[in-house]
């Protein structure tokens, strides 16, 4: 792995301070019609709640959080699923974010881990080496195919080491970025049509970035991985607490948030009118809020779909940047089987499937029915991303279930009863998110990314997609909410706090 100091020293957060625009009195007719606050926070996900807490800590309590859903949580979202064998009580599964990614070093913790520990959320490190490999005629047993799999793993490891070194050189030498596919090929990793090689690659690239190598930046994929997994320990702790992963920031919100006066749930924003003097938010129910400052924490997917209008229209440099980043889709498909029908080795965490025809076709199964997770639950889930996610979302549950069961019967070479419960969430079709999390594609420059983040007058933007290093991670949402809250608190206290923008970018 690259030295993170080497990379991060070359990738500084692009921020510049200029004098904040003073808020001024708004027109009397707007004042009369709309409720009035100092700060409007749009979205009650992790970025929004973190920004609100920062403001509250600074003594700024005249704010309102506006949220589309009937809950705090955003993409950290669990759901009742299946039934416990000895009662009618359900289990709970995480439909969205599920892991604490990067845990701690000798000197500091990932802030997500700190909060998970604060509220005693049950979490366990995933062991990605606890893996059994399958193809269409069953398990890859010791023998020729098993040796080939080990050989491919070794080749991939060597290629990724060169790939990561090259990413550092791209940054240090200010070279043109390229796709992860090109970078891996230069490092002599060329899986072409070999299913085992494709499966290994999928479990490393697609499973992490919700996009294939062709859609992923070599340079920034390495920055993204190194900042989490070298700054902190290279661990992924799966949260499997029945209270839900979002508990940690729901509980934080209870410490300061007055839900009667500072939180508007089930409120759909339709227009944001902004200037260097104030921001007015118009909602579908006819209500409106005028604020001195606003923080927009909408997902990249919502901004790309343009389902919320802006007045004036977002400048071209910002629209270009928004459309140039990628919103990935990561779909977990859950199945519960009767205890007597569990057909997999309960000591194994992961099952990798190398489909002979289609790369990424129901490739990665994970067992929750394991002594370290939700023992006795009979729950197995499979993850798909990108194009396969879109296919799954477009077809009915029965079709998807039939396809998965055909794969499982090929893998395990036996008759397997259908699951007693089955569910997946359609993230791409959710009108409040339109996807799972962001990814950095080849061709998106650091300056263009900063334009997603840059404020427009008194309107600020924050979320996992706006962080140049932790995009796609919960810690990205946390840090960006914190940064935006601190910047606006600084503005309110008549200090500097504007972020830089790049209106004229020439490649």
Language model feature labels by segment:
Residues 5-12, 21-507:
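FAD-dinucleotide binding site
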């Amino acid at each position: 792995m690259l030295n993170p100091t080497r990379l991060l020293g070359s990738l500084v957060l692009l921020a510049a301070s200029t004098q904040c625009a003073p808020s001024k009195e708004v027109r009397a007719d707007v004042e009369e019609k709309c409720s009035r606050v100092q700060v409007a926070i749009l979205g009650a996900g992790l970025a929004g709640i973190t920004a609100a807490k920062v403001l509250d800590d600074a003594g700024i309590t005249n704010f309102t959080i506006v949220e589309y859903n009937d809950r705090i949580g955003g993409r950290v979202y669990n759901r009742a699923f299946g039934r416990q064998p000895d009662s009618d009580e359900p289990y709970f599964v995480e439909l969205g974010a599920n892991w604490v990614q990067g845990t701690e070093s000798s000197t500091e913790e990932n802030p997500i881990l700190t909060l998970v520990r604060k509220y005693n959320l049950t979490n366990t490190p995933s062991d990605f080496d606890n893996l059994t490999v399958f193809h269409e005629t069953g398990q890859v047993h010791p023998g020729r195919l098993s040796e080939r799999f080990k050989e491919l793993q070794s080749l991939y490891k060597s290629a990724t080491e060169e790939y990561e070194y090259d990413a550092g050189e791209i940054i240090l030498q200010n070279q043109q970025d390229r796709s992860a596919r090109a970078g891996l090929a230069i490092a002599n990793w060329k899986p072409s049509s070999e299913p085992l090689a494709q499966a290994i690659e999928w479990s490393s690239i697609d499973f992490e970035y919700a996009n294939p190598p062709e859609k992923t930046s070599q340079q920034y994929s390495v920055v993204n991985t190194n900042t989490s997994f070298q700054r902190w320990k290279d661990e992924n702790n799966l949260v499997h607490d029945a209270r839900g992963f979002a508990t940690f920031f729901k509980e934080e919100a209870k410490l300061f948030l007055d839900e009667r006066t500072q939180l508007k749930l089930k409120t759909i924003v339709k227009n944001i009118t902004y200037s260097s003097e104030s921001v007015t938010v118009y909602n579908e129910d006819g209500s409106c809020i005028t604020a001195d400052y606003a923080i927009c924490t909408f997902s990249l997917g919502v901004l790309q779909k343009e389902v919320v209008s802006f007045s004036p229209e977002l400048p071209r440099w910002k629209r270009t940047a928004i459309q140039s980043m990628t919103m990935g889709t990561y779909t977990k498909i859950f199945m519960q089987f009767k205890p007597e029908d569990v057909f997999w080795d309960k000591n194994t965490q992961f099952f990798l499937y190398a489909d002979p025809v289609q790369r990424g076709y129901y490739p990665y199964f994970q067992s929750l029915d394991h002594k370290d997770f939700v023992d006795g639950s009979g729950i197995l889930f499979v993850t798909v991303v990108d194009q396969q996610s879109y296919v799954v979302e477009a077809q009915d549950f029965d079709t998807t279930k039939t396809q998965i069961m055909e794969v499982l019967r090929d893998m395990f070479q036996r008759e397997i009863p259908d699951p007693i419960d089955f569910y997946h969430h359609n993230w791409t079709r959710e009108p409040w998110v339109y996807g799972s999390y962001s990814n950095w594609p080849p061709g998106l420059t650091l300056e263009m990314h900063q334009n997603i983040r840059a404020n427009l007058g008194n309107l600020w933007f924050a979320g996992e997609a706006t962080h140049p290093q932790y995009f796609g991670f919960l810690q990205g949402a946390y840090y960006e909410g914190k940064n935006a809250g601190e910047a606006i608190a600084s503005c309110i206290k008549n200090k500097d706090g504007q972020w830089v923008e790049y209106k004229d970018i020439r490649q």
